[in-house]
């Protein structure tokens, strides 16, 4: 499985999200409790979510050993008042390195690595933020679609 990387222009996506500090490699244990809170909030606020995606927004630290802020969110249709752990946030706008990961979530690291290698080979600088836009889960995990985008400087 080898992803193709392209440069795209990303538009901001508005999210209802819960931010957590997570070490690289521990996202798998943190995402569900955070998203459960977001979905509970959305059920209590009808019309806020119409057809958006689950999106994880990563705020990369300069030290790869440090925890990073991750906004575990759901795309929403309008602005809202934050409540408790639920924050209003947006993905960045601008030029991004973008790749489509096709396959199990457990193998997304491979697509992230392809983007990092592409950036290095093309002398592009990553700007410290990336996000994953999740499609609907497939019955066959090998068919899951997740768009991965890294903001470029």
Where are these regions (language model features)?
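A solvent-exposed interaction/effector surface
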Residues: 1-153
């Amino acid at each position: 499985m080898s992803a193709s990387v392209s440069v795209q222009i990303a538009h901001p996506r508005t999210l209802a999200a819960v931010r957590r500090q997570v070490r690289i490699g521990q996202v798998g244990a943190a995402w569900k409790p955070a998203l459960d809170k977001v979905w509970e909030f959305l059920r209590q606020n009808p019309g806020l979510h119409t057809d958006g995606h689950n999106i994880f927004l990563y705020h990369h630290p300069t030290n790869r050993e440090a925890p990073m802020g991750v906004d575990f969110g759901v795309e929403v249709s309008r602005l809202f008042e934050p409540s408790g752990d639920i924050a209003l946030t947006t993905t960045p706008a601008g030029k991004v390195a973008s790749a489509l990961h096709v396959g199990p979530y457990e193998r997304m690291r491979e697509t992230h690595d392809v983007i990092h290698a592409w950036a290095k080979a093309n002398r592009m600088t990553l700007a410290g933020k990336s996000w994953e836009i999740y499609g609907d889960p497939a019955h066959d995990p090998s068919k899951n679609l997740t768009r991965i985008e890294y903001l470029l400087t």
